[in-house]
Amino acid sequence: MSATHLPDTQNSADTRHIIIDKVGIKDIIHPITYIDCDGNKMPTIGMFTMTVSLPEHVKGTHMSRFIEILNENSCEFSAHNFDQIIDKVKEKLESDTAHITLNFPFFRKKEAPSSGVKSMMDYQVTLYGTLNKGEVQVMIKVVVPVTSLCPCSKSISKYGAHNQRSHITIKAKVSKGRTLHIEDLIDLAERKASCELYALLKRDDEKMVTERAYDNPAFVEDLVRDIAVDLNADDKISYYCLESENFESIHNHSAYALIENLKC
């Protein structure tokens, strides 16, 4: 029997009359190319979750069409063009709502502060795209690892201060008609930290980053407040959720702070 004569069970009627808010595929891994703010193309691996709503009278969605969308397209993404794949899901799945999440490692080449030796630094990035009532919204989340050094420890200790790796997480909704780059959020987080991280450091670099952190102590509260000042002033961002988790080197727990702001 040819495919054209096989029954299409998904399109059959459903008598329970219950709308499904989200149905689709979750955590499918697919190669992608990310285009950075300078137009450079970076091959990486993305994990997608793609869903649509399902009317009460339809039995099932067409799961294979989500995969077809990934296979038919070049899978070249940037924060600026992410809304295009949402439109493709809407058209191919014939739905009024669509939700897409793309999670991937993003790499930047960084120079060590003294020796200038270059290495690749990785950041975990998530793009969120939502279509609802004809409006497309895009959000960017980036996790930026940094160094934080305790101001209290510095003030009371003769020989140094405890410091640790911290994760600053910024989730930002892009204002309508504006472009927000991943690099903008990474630069902001690293600029406000006690010191940024590098994959490769020589001895003179290690001396420099250690002293830089000592000269720029910051509580977890300082980190989120300093970053929030800049996020509040950035009209490319209409909403943000900002977190910092410090993996305390002298405790078996983390210090944590969060600021959330719906700007408009």
UniProtKB/Swiss-Prot annotation:
Pathway: Cofactor biosynthesis; 7,8-dihydroneopterin triphosphate biosynthesis; 7,8-dihydroneopterin triphosphate from GTP: step 1/1
Catalytic activities: GTP + H2O = 7,8-dihydroneopterin 3'-triphosphate + formate + H(+)
Keyword Hydrolase: yes
InterPro entries cross-referenced by the UniProt entry: GTP_cyclohydrolase_FolE2 (IPR022838), GTP_cyclohydrolase_FolE2/MptA (IPR003801)
Keywords: Hydrolase
EC supergroup of this enzyme: hydrolase
Gene Ontology molecular functions: GTP cyclohydrolase I activity
GO biological process, one term: tetrahydrofolate biosynthetic process
Residues under site feature: May be catalytically important: C150
EC number: 3.5.4.16
NCBIfam families in the cross-refs: PRK13674.1-1
Similarity-based family: Belongs to the GTP cyclohydrolase IV family.
Purpose of the protein: Converts GTP to 7,8-dihydroneopterin triphosphate.
PANTHER family for this protein: GTP CYCLOHYDROLASE MPTA
Name the record gives this protein: GTP cyclohydrolase FolE2
Source organism: Vesicomyosocius okutanii subsp. Calyptogena okutanii (strain HA)
Name of the gene this protein is made from: folE2
